[in-house]
Curated annotation (Swiss-Prot):
This is Large ribosomal subunit protein bL27. GO terms for molecular function: structural constituent of ribosome. Keywords: Ribonucleoprotein, Ribosomal protein. Belongs to the bacterial ribosomal protein bL27 family. InterPro entries: Ribosomal_bL27 (IPR001684), Ribosomal_bL27_CS (IPR018261). SUPFAM superfamilies: Ribosomal L27 protein-like (SSF110324). The keyword Nucleus does not apply. One of its GO terms (biological process) is translation. It comes from Buchnera aphidicola subsp. Baizongia pistaciae (strain Bp). The keyword Transcription does not apply. Residues 1-25 are annotated as: Disordered.
Amino acid sequence: MAHKKAGGSSRNGRDSHSKRLGVKHFGGETIRSGSIIVRQRGTKFHAGNNVDCAKDHTLFATSQGKVKFEKKGKCNRTYVSIIPE
């Protein structure tokens, strides 16, 4: 009687979609109110003046103006602010 061993099933073959994180508007760019500035996991960048933080830590503009990135504070954190024009 001819026999052939059954082929095993692979445990690979899955992958998640990329989340498109990162800086969407860079320093010096002029943006409108409500525009997303940074998409991130956690608070790599912190909200400064005229910027708010969503529940998934996305930073967005609350007024129109120019984007400004600056390091300040005791922990040398990076803050994102909007300078009104």
